[in-house]
């Protein structure tokens, strides 16, 4: 690590500790040339996740957008807020574990539907009606019949 005082390239670590959030490590270093001490921080570099929309447009993944969409589907349903946030946490964790830089919005939509189906069928159908863009009542009816057959 380059010393900010004399620009020497070698230093030794004299103290290391996690920050309060445990997202980085604070290190106190001592320059081996001039003896001055300085602080550095080490953290994992986050690679932003890009979502590829149906029209091909790309935008940054937005946790709040996902949460809002699921909350609309669950409106006036007996689903605790903690459960909805757990769904978003699970999806976000799964996306991070995929180690991809880009993901299709359709893949995220399928992940949401998979989870909502197990939580509340009405919320599932509401989400599906927007996500699958039902154009008429027959498509909506087919989705309901498919859901009933699985039960």
From Swiss-Prot:
Domain ATP-cone: 49-139
Cofactor: Zn(2+)
Sorted UniProt keywords: ATP-binding, DNA-binding, Metal-binding, Nucleotide-binding, Repressor, Transcription, Transcription regulation, Zinc, Zinc-finger
GO MF entry, a single one: zinc ion binding
Intrachain disulfide bonds: none
Pfam families: ATP-cone (PF03477), Zn_ribbon_NrdR (PF22811)
Alphabetical GO biological process terms: negative regulation of DNA-templated transcription
Renumbered zinc finger spans (unnamed): 3-34
UniProt keyword annotation of Ribonucleoprotein present: no
InterPro entries, A to Z: ATP-cone_dom (IPR005144), NrdR-like_N (IPR055173), RNR_NrdR-like (IPR003796)
Entry's cofactor comment: Binds 1 zinc ion.
Keyword Nucleotide-binding (UniProt): yes
Function per UniProt: Negatively regulates transcription of bacterial ribonucleotide reductase nrd genes and operons by binding to NrdR-boxes.
Family: Belongs to the NrdR family.
Protein's name in the database: Transcriptional repressor NrdR
Biological source species: Halothermothrix orenii (strain H 168 / OCM 544 / DSM 9562)
């Amino acid at each position: 690590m380059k010393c900010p005082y004399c620009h020497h390239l070698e230093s030794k670590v004299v103290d290391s500790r996690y920050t309060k959030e445990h997202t980085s490590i604070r290190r106190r270093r001592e320059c081996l040339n001039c003896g001055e001490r300085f602080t550095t921080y080490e953290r994992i570099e986050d690679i932003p996740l890009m979502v590829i929309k149906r029209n091909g447009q790309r935008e940054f993944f937005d946790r709040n957008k996902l949460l809002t969409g699921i909350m609309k589907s669950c409106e006036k349903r007996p689903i605790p807020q903690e459960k909805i946030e757990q769904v978003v946490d699970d999806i976000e964790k799964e996306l991070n574990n995929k180690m991809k830089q880009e993901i299709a919005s359709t893949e995220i939509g399928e992940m949401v539907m998979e989870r909502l189906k197990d939580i509340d069928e009405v919320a599932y159908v509401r989400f599906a009606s927007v996500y699958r863009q039902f154009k008429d009542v027959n498509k909506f009816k087919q989705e309901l019949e498919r859901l009933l057959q699985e039960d």
